[in-house]
């Protein structure tokens, strides 16, 4: 007999809690009626269902939704919070790492994504440090995206051995 999924009740609960928060009947925290809160609630529902029923893709999507919601909720409140591009890449890498680390799949890809997002976050500081050490950075500032495009294309086009995973 096939077991029924708890996904629909979890999603319904998340949407209902958001509707209650948006109605303003209770003031729990500032910004409770904004759309990032809905993303976090839906993400939490997917995380719970994915963990409870061992559905890794739902767990990954849940972490990603929760992280994106958290980013857009926290960004206006804290000045030090990273920009969209860096943080979204970080959230993708973090979600992939957490959801697949038990199976030891995609760990290299997840860590690479996290490192790339950290590189982007600290890019200005790295360039300032190189310039203070009197290392020319004009070419690096202009052409670094093309280096990563080249690396990506090279990784896509080379034949992979089956022993990678």
UniProtKB/Swiss-Prot annotation:
It is a multi-pass membrane protein. The chain crosses the membrane at residues 6-26, 28-48, 54-74, 78-98, 110-130, 138-158. One of its GO terms (cellular component) is plasma membrane. It is found in: Cell membrane. Keywords: Cell membrane, Membrane, Transmembrane, Transmembrane helix. This is Uncharacterized membrane protein YsxD. It comes from Bacillus subtilis (strain 168).
